[in-house]
């Protein structure tokens, strides 16, 4: 059910970590929020928490989505518009980390899995958001891509993740120019290490550029939200 005058946000990777924190913050701010992710159960948990904290149950929708599948992403945005009428904000957040071990031992499939989610998936979501925001009335919206500090400071044995995050920066900069014609603002956040499952190993120590193993500080994911 569309709530009168409420804005609508789509949050990918919305079942855990940074995505969940952002989804809950948006729900608290009065948004209608669609959370997308690979598994339905964590999405349902995010929706339930939004209801418990903010009474936002009718403003929440969880849609299991593989962002590396263009057809699934198209369906995500179609269902969002069907339920809430429009899309005002995309937090383009879904991502995955590197395969384990040295890149010398990675298979082509392991490389592609990272690229398919971190880069291709981000493009598919951005593309569908653009199409939706271009065609709706009033036109326009905002897209925030979740980049990474790895786009600025790579670590050893992180070539898949680091390469995709550098590519995301280029995607963001170009999309920001392309969005002007449609009143679509595109930006990017490059946070440090948030306390999520993906970054949990940072607290145990990870390889540094100088060859040392060092513990890296973590921030609460809620700070991002």
Give the ranges of each region predicted by the language model:
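Residue(s) in the substrate-gating loop at a strand-loop-helix junction
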Residues: 148
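Substrate-binding pocket helix/loop in short-chain dehydrogenase/reductase
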Residues: 101-103, 110-112
């Amino acid at each position: 059910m569309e709530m009168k005058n409420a804005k609508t946000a789509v949050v990918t990777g919305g079942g855990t970590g940074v995505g969940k924190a952002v989804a809950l913050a948006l729900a608290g701010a009065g948004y209608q929020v669609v959370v997308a992710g690979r598994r339905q159960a964590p999405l349902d948990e995010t929706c339930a928490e939004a209801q418990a904290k903010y009474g936002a149950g009718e403003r929440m929708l969880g849609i299991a989505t593989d962002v590396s599948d263009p057809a699934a992403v198209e369906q995500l945005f179609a269902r969002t518009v069907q339920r809430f009428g429009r899309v005002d904000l995309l937090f383009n957040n879904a991502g995955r980390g590197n395969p384990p071990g040295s890149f010398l031992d990675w298979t082509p499939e392991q490389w592609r899995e990272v690229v398919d989610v971190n880069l291709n998936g981000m493009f598919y979501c951005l593309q569908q958001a653009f199409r939706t925001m271009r065609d709706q009335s009033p036109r326009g919206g905002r897209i925030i891509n979740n980049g990474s500090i790895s786009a600025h400071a790579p670590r050893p044995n992180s070539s898949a993740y680091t390469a995709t995050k550098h590519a995301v920066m280029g995607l963001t900069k170009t999309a920001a120019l392309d969005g002007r014609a449609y009143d679509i603002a595109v930006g990017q956040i490059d946070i440090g290490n948030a306390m999520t499952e993906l970054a949990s190993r940072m607290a145990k120590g990870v390889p540094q550029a100088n060859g040392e193993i060092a513990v890296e500080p973590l921030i609460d994911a809620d700070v991002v939200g």
